[in-house]
Curated annotation (Swiss-Prot):
Source organism of this protein record: Arabidopsis thaliana (Mouse-ear cress)
Segments on the Cytoplasmic side according to the record's topology features: 654-993
Family the UniProt entry places it in: Belongs to the protein kinase superfamily. Ser/Thr protein kinase family.
A GO molecular function held by the record: protein serine kinase activity
EC assignment: 2.7.11.1
Protein name (Swiss-Prot/TrEMBL): LRR receptor-like serine/threonine-protein kinase HSL2
Protein localization: Cell membrane
Classification via InterPro entries: Kinase-like_dom_sf, Leu-rich_rpt, Leu-rich_rpt_4, Leu-rich_rpt_typical-subtyp, LRR_dom_sf, LRR_N_plant-typ, Plant_LRR-RLKs, Prot_kinase_dom
Amino acid sequence: MLTNTNLFFFLSLLLLSCFLQVSSNGDAEILSRVKKTRLFDPDGNLQDWVITGDNRSPCNWTGITCHIRKGSSLAVTTIDLSGYNISGGFPYGFCRIRTLINITLSQNNLNGTIDSAPLSLCSKLQNLILNQNNFSGKLPEFSPEFRKLRVLELESNLFTGEIPQSYGRLTALQVLNLNGNPLSGIVPAFLGYLTELTRLDLAYISFDPSPIPSTLGNLSNLTDLRLTHSNLVGEIPDSIMNLVLLENLDLAMNSLTGEIPESIGRLESVYQIELYDNRLSGKLPESIGNLTELRNFDVSQNNLTGELPEKIAALQLISFNLNDNFFTGGLPDVVALNPNLVEFKIFNNSFTGTLPRNLGKFSEISEFDVSTNRFSGELPPYLCYRRKLQKIITFSNQLSGEIPESYGDCHSLNYIRMADNKLSGEVPARFWELPLTRLELANNNQLQGSIPPSISKARHLSQLEISANNFSGVIPVKLCDLRDLRVIDLSRNSFLGSIPSCINKLKNLERVEMQENMLDGEIPSSVSSCTELTELNLSNNRLRGGIPPELGDLPVLNYLDLSNNQLTGEIPAELLRLKLNQFNVSDNKLYGKIPSGFQQDIFRPSFLGNPNLCAPNLDPIRPCRSKRETRYILPISILCIVALTGALVWLFIKTKPLFKRKPKRTNKITIFQRVGFTEEDIYPQLTEDNIIGSGGSGLVYRVKLKSGQTLAVKKLWGETGQKTESESVFRSEVETLGRVRHGNIVKLLMCCNGEEFRFLVYEFMENGSLGDVLHSEKEHRAVSPLDWTTRFSIAVGAAQGLSYLHHDSVPPIVHRDVKSNNILLDHEMKPRVADFGLAKPLKREDNDGVSDVSMSCVAGSYGYIAPEYGYTSKVNEKSDVYSFGVVLLELITGKRPNDSSFGENKDIVKFAMEAALCYPSPSAEDGAMNQDSLGNYRDLSKLVDPKMKLSTREYEEIEKVLDVALLCTSSFPINRPTMRKVVELLKEKKSLE
């Protein structure tokens, strides 16, 4: 039986509970209405946002946090829907909840603009976090009523324009994060008056070139300043060094000049300094040595000089990066005493002296790169003392002595590059067994010993490069167990025995170099199973037997050198199937007639030193003659001379007027492939009737030879006003296509460089360009509308061609004019990337990336040009990735990049991004909406080309390819995948079906 006291307590709780429930009912109705009218929840994460008889309080709903407010009422204070995959516009209606102070909607697909008028409902907010969505338009303005706003995070959206002046009035603001938006203007000085700021992040914004405002030095509470990749110029203002609470200073990837201020030593709390990839000069200030809290220090890729001060070397750094500068002098021994050192990169400098012996003894060093310096002496024996070392890179120094035995016990090690040193002695036996992905000991070392069978334990090894040493013994059969091998370079050693026939197991091989050894036996025909092989060099050995005809089955082989061996037999005609850029079988014992396809001047040196080979008209190769033919040589020769003389006289009479009118042509002909025609077969066909296209650099002709073969001939403009451009196009096409061999890149067969004009001869693509097939309005076109299977195949093929240019060509090539009109289609609709008139070679970097190249003008075609052309002259292969993303969108939509149906100031990228989200847009904030109109998350029927008849499976596949296209067309190059990754993603999308 309850006592009076207990009864009173029970009734009080019951009354309070009822009051709390009633007070939150209004919040529940607001939330439910916003969900129905403004948000789309494809994954059903908000399915519990339902008002029922037993569940009228939202405090237990997903993403909702309630607190007891004044008056003992339970009310909604926080809405956090981050990562729930919701779409729609900004939910202004949330702000009708009077007690709401925090909104977090990060990592969703929300889009549209954020308008100032309805946003005023949210003036009581303290935290507004909208990172990683697709909001666009101008940054939202904030009225003076937003006096309590402390955190504003809008990172990784699509906001444009300048930072509004109203942001300077948000005096309570502690965090401002606008990272990764395509804003313009400059870093505004008024931000320096937001003195409560602790974090300011304006990284990865394409501001106009401008200096760092000195007013930022007023932000005395700032702990985190990020201005990475923000187009900053000028010197680092000394006022920044007044920020004594600063823990992170990131000014990397800009164009800052001048010296690092000596006053940097005042940043006594700083943990990380990132100044890499600028144009800073001078010496490192010794005052940096006073920063005892500093753990990450990166000043790489600048123009810094001088020696490394011992005081800085003594800092307890975790990451220490000085690479790509002009530092000189020795490396202080004290750097080895650092117990925190994990990453040490000082490559591409001019350091001298020896490496400190105790490096690695006191720290768990993981990555060690001292390459391209002038270090001498021995390798530090304790680098892997703590068993954490993963990468050791020491190439291009003068290091000597043996590889320490201790390295053989370093099972954490997976990447070794020690080429171009003076190392000697035997490689430790256990060294070969390490779980490496790359082992490079090549060039100018004097290492010796043999490759043990235990190398099979290095199961993930992809590159084995040990050329120019004193290695000997046989090539172990166990090498064939390394199924990930892409490169084998054993050249310029003393290996004996035969090439293992099990080489056919290495399906990923791309390059095999075994030249200048003492290998004997026969070339294994099984090598024909290595279908990725592009280069095979077995020259200067003692190989016997015949050339395997199976070599002709290697689909992408473009370099074959078998010279200086003891090979016998005839040259297999099957080799004519290869698309060879380099071919050499000279100095062997080959005999018989050279296959007709090789009987060209370009191949003449390839056959020298084989006295028993013969071919007509290929001096100094002897002509092929039989004994029976010899008796008839004289009379036949006389008859031929008489006939030829008569023909010449007749020809002279017929063409005499032409000779009077026109001087003799002097043309330089270069042949890049085996061809059965000459320039004289082409000249007469360059008529107006055969023109099939024209462009900025010249006319394109369709030329059909008497043999039935059809060619495409590009005749470049020769007029004075256009000669410079045509010369540039001619040179670019020849320098790129002349050495590129890939199944998805158009073949350049021949070029003619004459006084009157230049022309380039290509294989003819029967189905024209992808742009013609997709967009042609001619009703008589032979090509029917492309189905999705064909479009997808074209996308993958074109991606593979571009991937080859970016990642497998040496040097890498950026196309700069990727578009649907430059993707040609053969009779099987197989794509070929074409038109390399704007192509540029890039410099490959050590980390397998490529450097930027400066462009004097914007290159490319309207609708395909990457956004970064608008704010920088330095572009890299990521501009091609953007253009390819546009092509993917063309394949999906069937529309041109700037189709008028998109509306004013909108291109195919914006159209696809908006259409992909497919959310309802009610006219009023709380306006009603027909739920039947929602459909699926992505209503692709409004996006895809209506000419395609698609199955459900194909719709799903298109949605996945659309994701790849939108990734490729990201506003920031750093967010775009490489073309190699694009190929992987596309193939993954197909394999998922």
